[in-house]
């Protein structure tokens, strides 16, 4: 059960990702359990979990990072050739008692756009939604860990915690050492080679 404590406003050090991050995962967007969007109102893009075999020590929980969709496959114009912020869960979702580990990614709007999850009351939160893009190749770069998985007393409590996760992810990615992975915040000549290489990987399909 989720502890009754206040949430930290950001996750990860201000200096930038530390090992094991960044973590690369990729795969086609597949159908999940269908509950994120239908029951919770939180659209997610699921990718196969077999890529986690390379990271056997990665704990289950909620993470943040950046994603890119193959523009040749995606019919979502706003994502074409873009790297977008994301919050994701890796694990079993104790609230639904899943027995199969999954990777569920919620793609957020660009950091320059207003945040749909900045405010809200339980049960009345609006999350960013894109048209379905099943089968589209997706690349994910995980940059930090937010919190463990928890069980919840209600769906409303789960939704509120995910809303806060989105805001923690946004604030974390707005910091200088992280926003560069989105292609913002610095002149390319001033960026280190590692960040440039990660961005090239994200956008090369």
From Swiss-Prot:
Keywords: ATP-binding, Flavoprotein, FMN, Kinase, Magnesium, Metal-binding, Nucleotide-binding, Transferase, Zinc. Mg(2+) binds at residues 44, 46. Pfam families: Flavokinase (PF01687). The active site is at 104 (nucleophile). Coiled coil: none annotated. GO terms for molecular function: ATP binding; metal ion binding; riboflavin kinase activity. One of its GO terms (biological process) is FMN biosynthetic process. It comes from Aspergillus terreus (strain NIH 2624 / FGSC A1156). InterPro entries: Riboflavin_kinase, Riboflavin_kinase_bac/euk, Riboflavin_kinase_dom_sf. Zinc or magnesium. It is an enzyme of class 2 (transferase). Catalyzes the phosphorylation of riboflavin (vitamin B2) to form flavin mononucleotide (FMN) coenzyme. It catalyses: riboflavin + ATP = FMN + ADP + H(+). Pathway: Cofactor biosynthesis; FMN biosynthesis; FMN from riboflavin (ATP route): step 1/1. Its EC number is 2.7.1.26. Residues 1-24 are annotated as: Disordered. Belongs to the flavokinase family. This is Riboflavin kinase. One of its GO terms (cellular component) is mitochondrion. Its cofactor is Zn(2+); Mg(2+).
